[in-house]
Amino acid sequence: MGLTFIEGTVKGPAGKEASVEFLVDSGAVYSLLPESVWKEIELTAKRRQRFLMADGTPIERDVSECHIELPQGDAHSPVILGQAGDEALLGVVTLEILGLVLNPFTRKLHPMRMILGSQRS
């Protein structure tokens, strides 16, 4: 298994932007912005939420929202406000909002097969 990184741009509510190299993490629910990035684009916490680390350790982090732009598209997404030393992560909520899925074999992002459901006659 390899790691997949993707370059993106994040924008805060006042229009400030920052470039970010995201680690695509299909095990992370929300995307995460390092402290230096979310402070640069002037994000503020909307709520505090509990998360579990990969080893099962519970932590609490602030959550906000920002505009995320990738080569495949852009959207508004919730983001965890990381602390010093945290790495930028692109989580599955952002991927799903953008209609993207990570192919685990090629380690590339591809358009998601979008199913609307059945149609009634």
Task: Name these PLM-found stretches.
Residues 1-121:
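Pepsin/retropepsin-fold aspartyl endopeptidases
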